[in-house]
Amino acid sequence: MAAGCRGPACPSWRLHISRELRRRDREQRQVFEELISQYKRLLEKSDLQSVLADKLQAEKYEQQSRHDSSPGPDGMRNDMLLQDMAQMRIKHQEELTELHKKRGELAQTVIELNNQMQQKDKEIQANEEKIAKYLQTIQDLETECQDLRNKLQELERANQTLKDEYDALQITFTALEDKLRKTTEDNQELVSRWMAEKAQEANRLNAENEKDSKRRQARLQKELAEAAKEPLSFEHDDDIEVLNDNADPVGDSAGAQATGRNISKRNSQPAVGGLLDSITNIFGLSESPSLSHRSDSSRRRSLNSFPASPDCADTPGAGNREVRVPATAVYSFDAHDGEVNAVRFSPGSRLLATGGMDRRVKLWDVIGNKCEAKGSLTGSNAGITSIEFDSAGSYLLAASNDFASRIWTVDDYRLRHTLTGHSGKVLSAKFLLDNARIVSGSHDRTLKLWDLRSKVCIKTVFAGSSCNDIVCTEQCVMSGHFDKKIRFWDIRTECIVRELELQGRITALDLNPERTQLLSCSRDDLIKITDLRANAVQQTFSAPGFKCGSDWTRVIFSPDGSYVSAGSAEGTLYFWNVLTGKVERMFSKQHSSSINAVAWSPSGTHVVSVDKGSRGVLWSDF
């Protein structure tokens, strides 16, 4: 077997088994070789004793036979033979006893050796099993080693590949870094050019607005001059005497002369506002309604052309007027080319602003029970989402889907500021009470505080959720979010003062005139009033048909805080009584699509609602 396995094709495990068997044969043969040889000698002695015993037995029989056949005189000799035989028998008996004793000892030794051999055989069998197990383990380990060698080779190849890829990526990174640096430089150059072009475009828009303003003023002066040339008949009454408050009442003729001087002096003045006031007072009792209408319209245009916004003084005593729920729709108009998202009255109630998906803010004069288009504010690159006037009505702030907020002056339609910095669409922007700062909330889950003096963002607060609407007090900003929470922020510390969680996504917020109650609308189709002093929900409004149409559906308090108004998804306008919590009135025929926003004039005389279908409706109780 060993000779057959010495060739180069013989497996290593066969050689190992052959060597182990030869080693075991040597070790066990040396241990038992002497014992086996002694056992053989004892067997030979036993056989010899048997032969001797047989021989002696034969001799005994022969002696007896001879003794029986021998004659009498030989008796002495027979006695001697008998004695010899007895002695030999005793001797042989002793030898036989000793042999039996040795045989017993040898048998015991053989038994013990057999036991040892059996034990050794068991040990050999156990060792063979261990050897087989070890051989199997060795084979498994060799297989595992081979697998590990293969894996090591694969890892080395992969490592080499990764090194090559790393070198290639490093080269690519260096090239991209150079490209990025070059692109950054190009971008800076493009931004500079873009800013210059934007400045030129703004200057062009401002120039066009300036031309429009000059044309309007020239047309107004021409109309006023024509109106002043027309012959008029009037009596000396209180209106004429108003122009002569500084003249001495010496008589009718002196008064008439003073009046003539006053009129000529006013006609010679270049100030359009003073001339307009004089003409309006003079023709207050005119019999020409068309002239009166032109004069009135001209007066409105002239007043709205000043930054001080005399629109605020158009409705004296409006705050003392009792607010009533509108009774009917008095005027319907197409506000924009597409969806209308926002609507707001100016502080004087005479000017209405609407914002839509056509990227424009449109201004409307509310004259009687009509809305007349006055102009539009351009510059936004996406749909308008929110509109806000400052407290004087001179500036208009609009948030847009192009990640920016913009400020225009109302009198000349000029774009004054563009506030960029959000990374998502801006859903709400509001003036703080000082009108020098602005807060904007965006879909990027941040709120930003802007300083209009420095035209920069001075604070950014991460709210953690998309902001849908904002309202402000002196030192607190309240924001409504997509995660169903209303957060109260301290402007000075940028910290959340408290949170109020509702059952649906917040779509709109509004404050009552005393700023003690917070109105909120959510996507669970509930409108709630929260008492800011008690930090608890005070009143909940709902209706069987009311359903919030979108995440930016706006709700509003009435100017005196007695009523709440909101539009539904199916186009119904609702009015609730704050004290009773019940529906005061509802209108369902004017809108054919979801109402997005509602505005209540500060004078309390009009309400405007706008919807997704580009329609605006003017409501009144007259």
Swiss-Prot record:
Plays an essential role in autophagy: interacts with ATG12-ATG5 to mediate the conjugation of phosphatidylethanolamine (PE) to LC3 (MAP1LC3A, MAP1LC3B or MAP1LC3C), to produce a membrane-bound activated form of LC3 named LC3-II. Thereby, controls the elongation of the nascent autophagosomal membrane. Residues 59-69 have a biased composition (Basic and acidic residues). It is found in: Cytoplasm; Preautophagosomal structure membrane. The keyword Protein transport applies. It comes from Xenopus tropicalis. It comes from the Eukaryota. Residues 59-78, 244-271, 287-320 are annotated as: Disordered. This is Autophagy-related protein 16.
